[in-house]
Amino acid sequence: MSRQLLRGTSLQRAANVVAATSSRPMVIQPAHPMEHRSPLQQQQCKLTPSIVIRRWKSFLHNNNSSAQTAAATTAEAATVTVTATPRRSQAETLNARGSHSPFDAPSRCMSTKSQNNMKFVTIDNINANFKAMEYAVRGPIVIRAGEIEKELLKGVKKPFDRVIRANIGDCHAMGQKPLTYLRQLMALTMEPRLLNSPEYPEDMKKRARDLLDACLGGSTGSYTDSAGIEFVRRQVAAFIEKRDGGVPCDYQNIYLTGGASPGIKSVLSLLNCTVDGKTPGVMVPIPQYPLYSASLTEMGMTRVDYFLDEDNCWGLDRKELQRSYNEAKKQCNPRVLVVINPGNPTGQVLTRKNIEEIIKFAYDNKMIIMADEVYQANVYDKNSKFYSFKMVMNEMGGPHRTQELISFLSVSKGYLGECGIRGGYMEVINMCPDVKAVLTKSITAQLCSTTAGQIAVSALVNPPQPGEPSYELYEKEKSAVLGALKERAKLVYDTLSTFEGYTVNPVQGAMYVFPKIEIPAKAVEAAKAKKMHPDVFYAFELLETTGICIVPGSGFGQIPGTYHFRSTILPQTDLLKEMMKKFGVFHTEFMKKYQ
């Protein structure tokens, strides 16, 4: 599924055509995508990444293809799910390639009668929304990167000696070291006998004892309240009040979650209700983080796209919000507005004025705001500042203080980067008490998030304070992480800005750069010949030539006719410099090849 591209349905492509000829582009995802697809497209949707890779390997074995041919073949397979071009017959394929393509309509992907006799659950009788789900940052390009890593271990010769995974915001995987105080706190709570060890500072021991006292039976192996350990929720509330300059925060509005994602999905599920015969619509920024598009497809909700202003450093314009809302009303019931600040994949930090405009728009149109604020500690530009939606909303006063809002934070980002521990929280603000009770009931059915994640949240919101034994080391490690990210943000921007045909906005925050590329017409035609999006074609050639793994912009959404990609700024500085150097050489050769 072509890096899990976001424009895979015929309805989606039709909307893109309309958008490309209009000054007001918008894309609306259907509530039930598979129902709008032709039989051919439905069959193509069954080509999962694992099937793509299995066939690719079989094709390599049978045809003894070169690595470059393998790259092109893999890329073609990756985009089969989104193309409207009719598939060639097997005879035509044999004439064209001299052998069967591993991607022609095969019996393994189809539910044959014999297979139906063997299995009660088949590809034809599972949830169609699950089959239609797409998630760009873990698709076939990343799978191909993993295959290349295995090939390198086996001694297969490549023009590079390692894969640089710039495709995902996984801080520790890219070399960031964990902060000492958090790991000490987790060690002490998971193995209480360490509380007697002189190797651990007393402030961490006290924090560990307080957390253990708040756990049933004094053990992190116990269930917690479904909303999370009350002691930690109170710590979160104190953290929010301090962050927002004293704006009150009730700990009973805090839910501890396994990272931000489960909280986001819980809220979307809560709001998944047909009103007046129309499916619920969720407005998401384009470009957007694929969690939203994947979740909405899974739930059968309608995705309503609003476009960020690339020429204004990916800012947000109220007129664009209203245009998107008005058009969506014809087909669905828009009731949720998603805002990601700082932005993923775009790396922008919204101005206070922008946030005020968003709040006014949501209030006027009776929409709830989902504020994805997981990168709030990642602000690098000296002229940018993070403002929480809650604080701005309260300072606006008047009726806007009653705006319904849910905000999210995670230990996966910021300066901790603890992606695998899965800790986070959401705060629900101005929610109807009856609705909140239903949300709580739903979360109760999930039992609770892990105690490890909840302890990590405690560490995030209650770090060492001045005068405590752990404070000096904490400040040193935190400053080193954020300082290095700021340096890399500038390095990536300065380097990519010199590339021919690149337009790059400064990385104001978050962990990503999202440049626009002018891909030569010859390369676009080469991509079309392989049934590929041009940015996917570019990304695969980059991977096979340099070992650099990025995510094509079509996986996040982009204005039709434009091409982008997302790269993280997370590789350690020396590796990032090497990556930028390789990138520059590749791009120069790519432009020469296709001019």
Mark where each language-model region is:
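Generic structural signal for small/hydrophobic residues in well-ordered secondary structure
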Residues: 141, 166, 236, 254, ...
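N-terminal "arm"/small-domain region of PLP-dependent enzymes with the aminotransferase-like
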Residues: 103, 108-227, 238, 242, ...
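Conserved core of the PLP fold type I
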Residues: 189-364, 370, 376-399, 406-407, ...
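Conserved PLP-binding catalytic core of the aspartate aminotransferase-like
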Residues: 124, 173-174, 180, 474-486, ...
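Short catalytic/ligand-binding loop motif for oxyanion handling, primarily in non-cytosolic enzymes
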Residues: 172-176, 182, 345-348, 365, ...
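Conserved PLP cofactor-binding pocket of PLP-dependent enzymes
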Residues: 132, 141, 163-164, 174, ...
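N-terminal mitochondrial targeting presequence
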Residues: 1-121
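Conserved core segment of the aminotransferase class I/II
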Residues: 112-119, 123, 181-184, 203-210, ...
